[in-house]
From Swiss-Prot:
HAMAP family: Meth_synth. This is 5-methyltetrahydropteroyltriglutamate--homocysteine methyltransferase. The gene is metE. Pfam families: Meth_synt_1 (PF08267), Meth_synt_2 (PF01717). One of its GO terms (molecular function) is 5-methyltetrahydropteroyltriglutamate-homocysteine S-methyltransferase activity. L-methionine binds at residues 435-437, 488, 603. InterPro entries: Cbl-indep_Met_Synth_N, Cobalamin-indep_Met_synthase, Met_Synth_C/arc, UROD/MetE-like_sf. The active site is at 698 (proton donor). CDD domains: CIMS_C_terminal_like (cd03311), CIMS_N_terminal_like (cd03312). Belongs to the vitamin-B12 independent methionine synthase family. L-homocysteine binds at residues 435-437, 488, 603.
């Protein structure tokens, strides 16, 4: 019979149970009681997620999709591959060790973190050196298999594949080629797979999303011998590709000695023909037709029409699946009691998507009539969404159509603007600032919760937030920072805040997804044309500026990041939606400028994240992304300084486009990579000002002034002092004030030391 399965389920829990359990564990100092509570939470979550999968009608549950922090880190733990610098015993790895690798400890900084392909999920980057070894690791996967079997479930295991695991890492300490480690890694996988077979696992899903990339020949050539080594003695292997078109590798993948392949038909529907043609008789083909990355309800009739010919060709060897893991969508629409009822009928979260997969399987096997009610309901929702008047705003469409190239460019060149800004602000060499947010304290959270519950009235909430702004300004003045921020106490999220105030956006109550570790975000839903009805940030920025003579930056989230970190409508091009958001932000920048705010930061941390995986598609994306930023930023006068911020990015390959943004100042995350990101600036003469991060805010570890001074000096080897800023890697929302106080004081101290050295070294 045709099999229905998913590639993975969200691990955080419907009420973010994993997040809160992790934070209690860390807060309690990883005590034995705290660890027991954490382990119990994980076990309960897995059982609940498997129950949802079973109740939806899936033919198997997926084990191995759970991770305490990150699935790449967990895979490294399974094959004994955590960085050697931590000195951990791979076979005796504890949870405390695991979290030390993720978050750093007193002896070692945390592992580097970056985006998982083109998603908003972050993985921990493996570190590979000539001394790297692999072997037996933790027992967690086998524990999960035993749990699932004890509950009576048929379990399919899921693992990040060996080629993808190597591809995602960084070569260090003189290692020339990561593939050189493959002969060491394959035996570790082979042993892991053999044990899974002994444990009674019939199928193992091996995730190899790198086959959706433009792979070098050496990596393509490594695929067949790798799987020839893995297949003997293993359970049946399902090699899963997703996130883009893998058809250029179709012949290679179909020739692998595995039992099946998975392809993503949501992101690359056209690839199906290349796989179905001459498909091997000994393989299943898993078709990912339910979107694992967006929240819109599946058009079941359309999907059935797409799958029916495949069913005719392959029979029971057709499997129905989600396009990728459901890690990227919220858990359950049932937990959205306050969401607009019409909008709700257009949506499907993870729990609903599992049922969509099973319903498609049922229609293929039993006929549409067997699930007619579900199909008819989905068809009615799709028709209503196509014709809903709430989606379309004629005024917005006219404004987008009227945009010209001049609207996306500043009136004067950077050199002219820089002179005007120096005259206006009079900043010292190596000016110090922060990225925007300060700690979201319990006081802030209590006030926000009381306001949302109606316990605190609007005026009381404003007063509470103003007090937090005053605290943030006073602290920054005490540190000695040169450019201040208001701290964003009023914002629960850098995208959701704006989504609450813009027309065309909707906000969920419980639509959380994991960003990394315990960090969860609640992406807004962009369901219709975007319009700014009134100023969003002017009152907060103006109040903060009234508290100090030093400049205070206005803080906005850029159009591409708003797009990338939301669940975006799929009925028009993303470029069009980006321009709509950009027009709204342009009006906000003009309102800020009119209110006397002389520096405005438009954050674009997701610019590179939106880059298509295929090289041939990138130029078009960068063109509209740069244009959208320009529309948002270019209406202001020469002496208004536009900042932007980018984090978690390796962007050497898009530096020309970053330069084309023409922001007066850009700040970037560089600490975890030890300023390696700045290597690109040795060959590309970035024309404007730049602030490479000198403090890793993702780790609780507090750097001292000597460490920060070393990083500033490293930056000065690549960036002229006249164009260098000093700032943390990212916003400080997730840190505690005691950490921030120490780190920013050290940062200002380090900047003053280096400033003195530079000035003393300058010719008289």
């Amino acid at each position: 019979m045709t099999t229905a399965h998913i590639l993975g389920f969200p691990r955080i829990g419907a009420q973010r149970e994993l997040k809160f359990a992790l934070e209690r564990y860390w807060r309690d100092g990883a005590s034995a009681d705290a660890e027991r509570a954490l382990v119990d939470t994980g076990r309960a979550l897995r059982a609940e997620h498997w129950r949802i999968e079973r109740d939806a009608g899936l033919d198997c549950v997926t084990v191995g999709d759970f991770a305490w922090y990150d699935h790449v880190l967990t895979t490294l733990a399974h094959v004994g591959g955590l960085p050697r610098r931590f000195g951990f015993d791979a076979r005796a790895l504890t949870l405390a060790d695991y979290f030390a690798a993720a978050r750093g400890n007193a002896a070692q900084p945390a592992m580097e973190m970056t985006k998982w392909f083109d998603t908003n999920y972050h993985y921990l980057v493996p570190e590979y050196s000539p001394a790297t070894t692999f072997g037996p690791g933790v027992e967690w996967l086998f524990d999960e298999v035993r749990e699932a079997r004890a509950l009576g479930y048929r379990a399919k295991a899921a693992l990040v594949g060996p080629l993808t695991l190597l591809w995602l890492g960084k070569a260090r300490d003189g290692l020339v080629e990561r593939l050189a480690l493959l002969p060491r890694l394959v035996p570790a996988y082979r042993a892991l797979l053999a044990r899974l077979r002994e444990a009674g696992v019939d199928w193992v899903q091996i995730d190899e999303p790198i086959f959706s990339l433009d792979l070098p020949d050496a990596w393509r050539d490594a695929a067949r011998p790798t799987y020839e080594a893995l297949a003997p003695g293993a359970p049946k292997l399902l090699v899963a590709t997703y996130f883009d078109d893998a058809s250029e590798h179709a012949a290679l993948l179909k020739a692998l000695p595995v039992a099946g392949l998975h392809v993503d038909l949501v992101r690359a529907d056209a690839q199906l023909d290349a796989f179905v043609a001459d498909y091997p008789a000994d393989k299943v083909l898993s078709c990912g037709i339910v979107d694992g990355r967006n929240v819109w309800r599946n058009d079941l009739d359309r999907s059935l029409a797409r799958l029916a010919p495949v069913r005719d060709a392959l029979g029971e060897r057709l499997w129905v699946a989600t396009s990728c893991s459901l890690l990227h969508v919220p858990v359950d629409l049932a937990h959205e009691p306050r969401l607009d009822e019409e909008l709700k009928t257009w949506l499907a979260f993870a729990a609903q998507k599992t049922r969509e997969v099973a319903a498609l399987r049922d229609a293929l096997v039993k006929g549409r009539a067997a699930v007619a009610a579900e199909f008819d309901d989905a068809a009615a929702a799709a028709a209503a969404r196509r014709t809903s008047a709430r989606i379309h705003n004629p005024l917005v469409k006219r404004r987008v159509a009227a945009l010209t190239d001049a609207d996306a460019r500043r009136a004067s060149a950077y050199s002219v603007r820089a002179a005007a800004q120096r005259a206006r602000f009079g900043l010292p060499l190596l000016p110090t600032t922060t990225i925007g947010s300060f700690p979201q304290t319990p006081e802030i959270r209590r006030a926000r919760a009381a306001f949302k519950q109606g316990v605190l009235d609007h005026l009381g909430y404003l007063e509470a937030m103003r007090e937090q702004v005053r605290i943030a300004i006073d602290k920054q003045l005490a540190y000695g920072l040169d450019v201040l921020v208001h701290g964003e106490a009023e914002r629960n999220d850098m995208v959701e805040y704006f989504g609450e105030l813009l027309w065309g956006f909707a906000i969920t109550s419980n639509g959380w997804v994991q960003s990394y570790g315990s960090r969860c975000v609640k992406p807004p839903l962009v369901y219709g044309d975007v319009y700014l009805p009134e100023p969003m940030t002017v009152g907060w920025a103006s109040y903060a500026q009234s508290l100090s003579a030093k400049p205070v930056k206005g803080m906005l989230t850029g159009p591409v990041t708003m797009l990338q970190w939301s669940f975006v409508r799929d009925d028009q091009p993303r470029a069009t939606t980006a321009l709509q958001i950009a027009l709204a932000l342009r009006q906000e920048t003009l309102d800020l400028e009119k209110a006397g705010i002389g520096m405005i930061q438009i954050d674009e941390p997701a610019l590179r994240e939106g880059l298509p995986l295929k090289a041939r598609e990138r130029a078009a994306y960068l063109d509209w992304a740069v244009r959208a930023f320009g529309i948002a930023a270019s209406g202001v006068a020469d002496d208004t300084q536009i900042h932007t911020h980018m984090c978690y990015s390796e962007f050497g390959d898009i530096l020309p486009s970053i330069a084309a943004l023409d922001a007066d100042v850009i700040s970037i995350e560089t600490t975890r990579s030890n300023m390696e990101l700045l290597d690109a600036f040795e060959t590309f003469d970035y024309p404007n000002e730049i602030g490479p991060g000198v403090y890793d805010i993702h780790s609780p570890r507090v750097p001292d002034a000597d460490e920060i001074e070393r990083l500033i000096l490293l930056a000065l080897e690549r960036i002229p002092a006249q164009r260098l800023w000093v700032n943390p890697d990212c916003g400080l929302k997730t840190r505690e004030w005691r950490q921030v106080d120490a780190a920013l004081a050290a940062m200002v101290d380090a900047a003053k030391r280096v400033r003195q050295k530079v000035e003393e070294a300058a010719p008289a």
